[in-house]
Amino acid sequence: VQFLINLFGVEVASQLVSRYFIATSKHWNGATVFWQIDTQGKVRTGKIMLYSPTTGKRVKNLELPVYWVHKALKQPEFELRQCLFGEHLLIDKIRPVAIVESEKTAVIASVYLPQFIWVAVGSLTNLNAEKCSILKGRTVTLFPDLNGFEKWSSKAKELSHLTIFTVSDLLE
C-alpha cells in the first residue's frame, strides 16, 4: 500500500485499495493481501505477499514467497477454489477485460488504462478454463509478462471456446 501511495498519492491509492479490497497482513511485517473475490462477492482466498515499500518489487528471499490467508488462519478443512484476482469487478458488463499475470500489475495498470477491467491470474501457468469460464462472451485482452507471449497465445487458442482472446505483446 505504501508503494501505491508513493506512486499515485493517497487519494488514488485509497481508491485502488477500496476497488481491489487490498489488505495488509502481520504474517510478514508490511505484507500485502490480495483477496480473490468472485462475482457473487464470495471471498475465495487471500494471497499474502511481501513487497518493498520503496521499490514495489517482491521480496523473494523468504522461506515461502507466497502464503495464503486460509493457511495463516489454520483452516485445515478449507477447500481452495481460486478465481481471478479482481473478478468481483466483472459485474461491469460494458468495459473490456484485460488479464495480466500479477495482482500488482492489474492494480497499477487500472490507473493507466482505466478503459479495461484489470484482473490477474496470479502466475504465467494459472491461465486456465476454470478461472476463465466467467469471461464467456466478453472482450478479453491478455497481457502476458516478458517471455510469456508464446505460452499465452497457445492458451488463448485452447480457451477460444469460452470467448475470443487477443494477446498483446506490449510487455514482451
Please tell me what each predicted stretch does.
Residues 1-20, 35-40, 96-99, 111, ...:
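Replication-associated primase and helicase/ATPase modules
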Residues 21-22, 29-30:
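Short, small/acidic-rich helices and loops at N termini and domain boundaries
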Residues 27, 33-138:
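Phosphate-handling DNA/RNA-contact segment within nucleic-acid enzymes
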